[in-house]
């Protein structure tokens, strides 16, 4: 599995954000995009997962495992995303949030996958919890478990550690990067913090928009 991003241009109606960018992310690796606010980092992720604001113009291609996915609807792209704010359904328990992500199948298999994820993320005691009662680190774990239960073939990380304190941030980085390696899927991380970089050899700095 590999994720490839070929960008000729990414622009707003009045401003060029990104030009002539080519990334190929190998399985089990995390490539980092760094840039200031407004440099187009999050918009690039939106172009990959299919949620780009229609006001922006993306001229390029997104390939997953050699196949173009930029013409597919978001739900067909097999790309997971972890946001800065761990977006959990507030009307569902933690278990129900996870079950929602599991692909269709028999009930017993789906429940088993959720149970395994709860144990793997060390959040089993929180299965029946209201998401509003979770700490920042717990929310990241639940959101990550939900993203992986959808069985993505690539993972996007939109500054998911930025709201955590320094110690928790380090632990969550290690958890996420380890899971990317274990699942052997490509991951693309955007951040403005150099401490979040998974591998300095896999780092692209975006220029200020102009």
What do these predicted ranges mean?
Residues 144:
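Hydrophobic anchor residue at the start of the ABC signature
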Residues 109-126, 177-178:
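Conserved ABC ATPase "signature" region
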């Amino acid at each position: 599995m590999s994720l490839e991003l070929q960008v000729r241009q990414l622009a707003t109606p009045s401003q060029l954000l990104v030009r002539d960018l080519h990334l190929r992310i190998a399985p089990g690796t995390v490539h980092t995009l760094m840039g200031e606010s407004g440099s187009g980092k999050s918009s690039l992720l939106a172009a990959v997962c299919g949620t780009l604001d229609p006001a922006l113009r993306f001229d390029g291609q997104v390939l997953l495992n050699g196949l173009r996915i930029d013409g597919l609807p978001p739900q067909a792209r097999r790309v997971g995303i972890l946001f800065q704010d761990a977006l959990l359904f507030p009307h569902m328990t933690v278990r129900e949030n996870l079950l929602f992500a599991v692909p269709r199948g028999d009930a017993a298999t789906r429940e088993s996958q959720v149970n395994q994820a709860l144990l793997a993320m060390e959040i089993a005691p929180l299965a029946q919890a209201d998401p509003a009662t979770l700490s920042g680190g717990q929310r990241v774990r639940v959101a990550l478990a939900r993203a992986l239960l959808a069985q993505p073939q690539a993972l996007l990380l939109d500054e998911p550690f930025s709201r955590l304190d320094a110690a928790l941030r380090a632990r969550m980085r290690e958890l996420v990067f380890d899971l990317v390696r274990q699942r052997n899927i490509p991951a693309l991380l955007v951040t403005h913090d150099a401490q979040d970089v998974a591998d300095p050899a896999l780092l692209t700095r975006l220029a200020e928009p102009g």
